[in-house]
Curated annotation (Swiss-Prot):
Gene Ontology annotations of biological process type: mRNA catabolic process; negative regulation of translational initiation; positive regulation of translational initiation; regulation of carbohydrate metabolic process
Coiled coil regions in record: none
Protein name: Translational regulator CsrA
Complexes and interactors: Homodimer; the beta-strands of each monomer intercalate to form a hydrophobic core, while the alpha-helices form wings that extend away from the core.
Subcellular localization: Cytoplasm
């Protein structure tokens, strides 16, 4: 895992076309902005896990999403 330190307003690059910008810090919360191409899905981890779980559940049921 790469660990970086960024200040509010600073950006990091992932590849050539994804940027992650620190928008704000308040207490133990950090607001970030992600710019990525439309074909790249960006989700919070808990949402991604729910999507994966629903895919698995629908495959087990034999239905499609």
């Amino acid at each position: 895992m790469l660990i970086l330190t960024r200040r509010v307003g600073e950006t990091l690059m992932i590849g050539d076309d994804i940027t992650v910008t620190v928008l704000g810090v308040k207490g133990n919360q950090v607001r970030i902005g992600v710019n990525a191409p439309k074909d790249v899905a960006v989700h919070r981890e808990e949402i991604y896990q729910r999507i994966q779980r629903e895919k698995t559940d629908s495959e087990d049921d034999g239905s499609s999403v």
